[in-house]
């Protein structure tokens, strides 16, 4: 006997606190799921509110408006005759829960609270929600009065239960629960659950998709079953980009996969599966023996068939064939992820475009290429008749008839660049900036900042009677650093002025978002001036290492047809803030006292491996001991932590950056540390003592 069910998983570009917009996107996804003949629709985690509401989850208004939206959704005529799984926060016994609402034909069947909350990395769910730490316990939830009147329903079961439909059993697993060692799907599978639904609010990190795919594949390969994974997509108001990639697996095989990076506000994937194949897959006696020894879940009986055809054989349905999993290269992830994040931020901020100080170096070049990538993605969406994208483009450029799908033409409307040179700038950097801007089509300005910086120096001399000098002219380190910082900070001031007025110069309305271009390695080392060009509105590369940026530009050179990028890759990274002499040319790595490759290693050990100075030294002795002496390794570690400690305060004012990597330094909520450090005296003594032992052993 065959029992074909068609099931749908959604990825929605929700916006935190945009209740009306979120409701419309949810309804659109339900309509699309029905158009694909699905009888079950699963949406992202907390889709009614948007996942990123943060402390708004502590406000009673958030719960009130969520119920209003839910009533509107499940009463909608287009949302009937399909089993709905909708995510929203619910308050039960004065406790806030992250919940799934399972509803059918205007009635709520079950409220399933999240059992295991996510509290690592960027996640702080226990700050807002209480976990349902009572396996298989179900209580009665009394609906708010206005909801009870609207639905003609006073109570609903709340807790860890499963749905018994006419021909199959449905169980719920929410995001983090999949990642835990003892995931709920294990016990649910042993109790006969055949369809698992997982709503997620999982953000993008380079190479993270592989982890999700492996977990779902392994779960269904081991336990058998049909697994629907739904994820939010887009920038919902913060540093994170939720990268979709909704999936449907059956017995270890992928049947459908949503796009990871896309501008579509609503995307629905579906698959048709024979439930009997799950039962056949679970033939092992050990599966049954383990099942009968486990306590049972409470079953909520639902008189609804997920399979529309009730005879033994359905000649009108064909099961979905397995497909290959799509995993992008890290370079592709950098090309598309930050670009889509930039577009969401731009259209939702109602700005007129972006302004970027284009220095002619690799970092600002990377940011410019990401904006160009964004315009290519936008124009492709317009070619595919995406009405929402077209509407947003016309509003941003201020032309209700705009229809061009030329990325360079669009970029010229909304992207402004400026080379802010000084007497220390080289012809090469100025030329590279101009050529890149010409190649991608930005509105480019070339300005000299010497007038501004000399005015500040003259004012200081007038007040103090002393004129600071560069080190090459006999000045002290303090003078040398101050003169560099004046140049850097004047660029920030000038950048915001240009962002405010350049659209006016061209006869356009609105102002621009200022883009920053400091990479994660420089932020970690503190190799940036506080309140210079690193201070901006947003930074698309602030979570990406120099090493990954170089790989990205090598990829973009071919993929985006930008041969000029090779010149940026070949150039020596330099701030160009000091005079160049016959014996001295400023270099970033020389200034820092460490290479970008070394910084990347330090960053991974510090954050991912959770190493302090001493354990980092012991780790690096294994990695670098064959080419460096113990004292050299010790010196590098001590130097890194010295500069990390004295510059940590800069992270507290860091421009909001696209979160891209697990070694990020975002002080907002990802990398929480003090910003006033001691001198690591005890740690340094321990490192020196161990280095001495290593060297004594080597001399024997």
From Swiss-Prot:
UniProt keyword terms in alphabetical order: ATP-binding, Ligase, NAD, Nucleotide-binding
Reaction it catalyzes: deamido-NAD(+) + L-glutamine + ATP + H2O = L-glutamate + AMP + diphosphate + NAD(+) + H(+)
Lineage top rank: taxon: Eukaryota
An example Gene Ontology biological process: NAD biosynthetic process
A GO CC term attached to the entry: cytosol
Binding site for ATP: 357-364
EC number(s) on file: 6.3.5.1
Recorded GO MF terms: ATP binding; glutaminase activity; NAD+ synthase (glutamine-hydrolyzing) activity
Matching InterPro entries: C-N_Hydrolase, C-N_Hydrolase_sf, Gln-dep_NAD_synthase, NAD/GMP_synthase, NAD_synthase, Rossmann-like_a/b/a_fold
NCBIfam families named among the record's database cross-references: nadE (TIGR00552)
Name of the molecule in the record: Putative glutamine-dependent NAD(+) synthetase
């Amino acid at each position: 006997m065959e029992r074909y069910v068609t099931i749908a998983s959604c990825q929605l570009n929700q916006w935190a606190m945009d209740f009306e917009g979120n409701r419309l996107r949810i309804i659109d996804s339900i309509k699309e799921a029905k158009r694909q003949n699905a009888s079950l629709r699963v949406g992202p985690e907390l889709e009614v509110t948007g996942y990123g509401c943060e402390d708004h989850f502590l406000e009673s208004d958030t719960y009130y408006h969520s119920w209003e939206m839910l009533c509107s959704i499940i009463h909608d005529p287009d949302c009937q005759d399909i089993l709905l799984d909708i995510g929203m926060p619910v308050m039960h016994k004065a406790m806030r829960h992250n919940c799934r609402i399972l509803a059918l034909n205007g009635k709520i069947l079950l409220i399933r609270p999240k059992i295991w909350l996510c509290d690592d990395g960027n996640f702080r769910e226990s700050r807002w929600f209480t976990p349902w730490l009572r396996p298989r316990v179900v209580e009665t939830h009394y609906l708010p009065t206005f909801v009870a009147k609207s639905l003609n329903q006073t109570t609903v079961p709340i807790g860890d239960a499963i749905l018994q439909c006419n021909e199959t059993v449905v169980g719920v697993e929410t995001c983090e629960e999949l990642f835990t060692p003892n995931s709920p799907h294990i016990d649910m599978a042993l109790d006969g659950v055949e369809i698992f639904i997982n709503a997620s609010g999982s953000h993008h990190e380079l190479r993270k998709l592989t982890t999700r795919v492996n977990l779902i594949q392994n779960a269904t390969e081991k336990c058998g079953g049909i697994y629907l994974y739904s994820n939010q997509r887009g920038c919902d108001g913060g540093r994170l980009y939720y990268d979709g990639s909704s999936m449907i697996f059956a017995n270890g095989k992928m049947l459908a996969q949503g796009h990871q990076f896309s501008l579509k506000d609503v995307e629905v994937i579906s698959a048709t599966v024979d439930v009997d194949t799950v039962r056949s897959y679970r033939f092992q006696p050990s599966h049954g023996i383990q099942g009968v020894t486990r306590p049972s879940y409470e079953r909520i009986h639902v008189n609804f068939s997920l399979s529309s055809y009730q005879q033994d054989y359905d000649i009108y349905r064909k099961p979905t064939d397995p497909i290959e999993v799509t995993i992008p290269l890290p370079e592709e992830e950098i090309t598309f992820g930050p670009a889509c994040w930039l577009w969401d931020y731009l259209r939702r901020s109602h700005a007129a475009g972006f302004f970027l100080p284009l220095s002619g170096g690799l970092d600002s070049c990377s940011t410019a290429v990401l904006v160009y990538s964004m315009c290519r993605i936008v124009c492709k969406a317009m070619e595919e008749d995406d009405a929402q994208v077209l509407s947003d483009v016309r509003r941003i450029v201020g032309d209700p008839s705009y229809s061009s799908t030329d990325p360079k033409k669009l970029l010229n409307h909304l992207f402004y660049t400026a080379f802010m040179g000084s007497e220390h700038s080289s012809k090469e950097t100025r030329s590279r900036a101009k050529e890149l801007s010409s190649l991608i089509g930005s509105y480019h300005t070339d300005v000299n900042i010497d007038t501004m910086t000399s005015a500040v120096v003259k004012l200081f001399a007038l007040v103090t009677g002393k004129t600071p000098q560069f080190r090459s002219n006999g000045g002290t380190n303090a003078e040398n650093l101050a003169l560099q910082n004046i140049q850097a900070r004047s660029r920030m001031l000038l950048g915001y002025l240009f962002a405010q007025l350049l659209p006016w110069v061209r006869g356009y309305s609105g102002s621009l978002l200022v883009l920053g271009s400091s990479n994660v390695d420089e932020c970690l080392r503190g190799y940036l001036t506080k309140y210079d060009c690193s201070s901006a509105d947003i930074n698309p590369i602030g979570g990406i290492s120099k090493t990954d940026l170089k790989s990205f530009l090598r990829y973009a050179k071919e993929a985006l047809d930008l041969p000029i990028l090779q010149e940026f890759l070949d150039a020596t990274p330099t701030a160009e803030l000091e005079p160049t002499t016959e014996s001295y040319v400023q270099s970033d790595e020389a200034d820092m006292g460490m290479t970008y490759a070394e910084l990347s290693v330090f960053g991974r050990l510090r954050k991912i491996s959770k190493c302090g100075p001493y354990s980092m030294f012991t780790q690096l002795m294994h990695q670098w001991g064959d080419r460096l002496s113990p004292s050299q390794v010790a010196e590098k570690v001590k130097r890194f932590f010295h500069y990390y400690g004295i510059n940590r305060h800069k992270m507290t004012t860091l421009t909001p950056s696209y979160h891209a990597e697990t070694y990020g330094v975002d002080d907002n909520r990802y990398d929480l540390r003090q910003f006033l450090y001691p001198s690591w005296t005890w740690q340094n003594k321990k490192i020196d003592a161990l280095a001495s032992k290593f060297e004594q052993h080597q001399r024997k």
